[in-house]
Amino acid sequence: MPSIRQWRFASLPTYLSAAQVRTVLDGCDRASSTGRRDYAILMLLSKLGLRANEVATLTLDDVDWRAGEMLVRAKGRQRAAMPIPLDVGAAVVAYLRDGRPKSSCRELFVRSLAPHIGFRSGSAITMIAKIARERAGIRGYARQGAHIFRHSLATELLRSGATLSEIGQLLWHKSHDTTRNYAKVDIGALRALSLSWPGGAQ
C-alpha cells in the first residue's frame, strides 16, 4: 500500500481575532518606558506582520521618517523598505522620545535594564509577545511565539477583502502555498479569491 504524502501546510494557522490583538495592545503600560517599548514592538508585529528576528535587528538608521519608511532585513537575507502606518510610527516615536534609555547602541529596541544593548536574537521579542498575551488573559497558545501576530494580520486582511497576492507581497512569501495556507481559515473567501490567484480553481 503506497504511503500517504503529508502536505507541509496541512494544518491550519493559529491566529488571534482582531479584538484579541487589541486587548493585547491595550494591556501594555504605556506610562512606563518598558511598556512603551513593548507596545511599539507589538505594533510592528501586529500591524506590519514582521517576524521576531526582523524586529530585533531593526536599527535607528533603518527608519526614514521623511519618507515614512522602514528598512527591514527579512528572511533569506532580503531587504525591503516598508511604509510605516501612522499608528505604528506614533508608537515608535513615543518609545524613542520617552522610553528608550540613553545608549550608544544603534539597535532600535534595547534592554530596559543596564546594559542598554540590543537583543541578540528574536527570542527576546518572542518572550515579550508571550508575556503580553498572558497579561491580556489570552491563553492556550503556549507553543505560539510572536509569529501568531503575523498569522493574525494575514487572516484579518483576508477577511477584510485583501487578495492572496496582496497578502503574499506584504508578508514577503516566496511560495504561493504559504499564503494559500491562511485562506484555509475562511473557505468562503478562498473560493471567491482563487480565480485571481495563479494556479487557483484548478
Protein language model features and the residues they cover:
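Conserved catalytic core of the tyrosine transesterase superfamily
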Residues: 1-202
